[in-house]
Amino acid sequence: MSGFGDFTTICETAPLPLCAAVGPVLQATGRTGIEPECYARNIELANTIIFEGATAVMHIVALVMTVIMILHVRSKFTAVGRKEILSFFYLYMLLSAMSLVIDAGVVPPGSDPYPYLVSVQNGFSSAVITCLLINGFVGFQLYEDGTPLSVWMLRISTLAAFTISFLVSLATFKSWAGLSPTNTVGLFVVLYLLNAIQLFIYVAMQILLVTRTLHDRWPLGDIAFGIFFFVAGQVFLYAFSSKICNAISHYLDGLFLATVCNLLGVMMVYKYWDSITKEDLEFSVGTRMNNWEVKELLPEEERRATVFSEDLYGQNSSYDLPYSPGAARYSAKY
């Protein structure tokens, strides 16, 4: 029976990348790892074997969708928390790219770089969650968003989360500092317990923000959908991955569905941020094309009758008068 922090039960159900670097030494291969009961079949393309083909495609889709969301956020120049939420999407893009490299088998399990790349992936996972938590404080206006204080606090907190998760993961995989592939309590606490606590705090803060400070209640729907997609992804991955994999003949597994649900959850984060963020149109006009395009020329009479000719303190210029070939060179008052 597995105890607290043991990955045996988790890895037998979910085909996680870290499962190839934790657990006892396998007699068949002589390497450390826990083999899942069922995982998606490999795809051979151009004499290259691609692991988790469907999941790899979803990582590419996630990268494309993240680029689109980043472009939309960047177009809102005066939105509250613009720089902070951009950091979240940049980190999610890095996490998706690293997951694509690992899940597709670009660096195969058992190779020397594999533990380091999985440690980087775990570091990005913790960094994304911490960045989301810090973004949750921006809406309360405890400090001015976009200032060096706000941006650097976000960067330092995110870097600290990445460093802790990376070092704990690498120490576990390499048997450093009293940790080992069979002593995974520290890894479990960092990856699962701390991240779950941060997500709970973020959701609680956003519900409080909407109910106490906003008149519109529609953002609660975005929060609800985000929670639903995230929880559904975790259930698919950790509870039903093997059953799904066996039911559809190894074509898909829980990792694919978890990747889809995580992408939908991130999209709900964008939708929620966009719904509670107002933009000053005076400063965002530059993002729209043809704002000053002249649709139709004014008639001659309307173009000459300008407000400047009606100024009580101004003098009429000869340019305000219609041109006449026989008129005198000087004004009548001279």
Curated annotation (Swiss-Prot):
InterPro entries: Chs7 (IPR022057). One of its GO terms (molecular function) is unfolded protein binding. Disulfide bonds: none annotated. It is found in: Endoplasmic reticulum membrane. It comes from the Eukaryota. Chaperone required for the export of the chitin synthase CHS3 from the endoplasmic reticulum. Belongs to the CHS7 family. This is Chitin synthase export chaperone. It comes from Gibberella zeae (strain ATCC MYA-4620 / CBS 123657 / FGSC 9075 / NRRL 31084 / PH-1) (Wheat head blight fungus). The lineage of its organism: Eukaryota, Fungi, Dikarya, Ascomycota, Pezizomycotina.
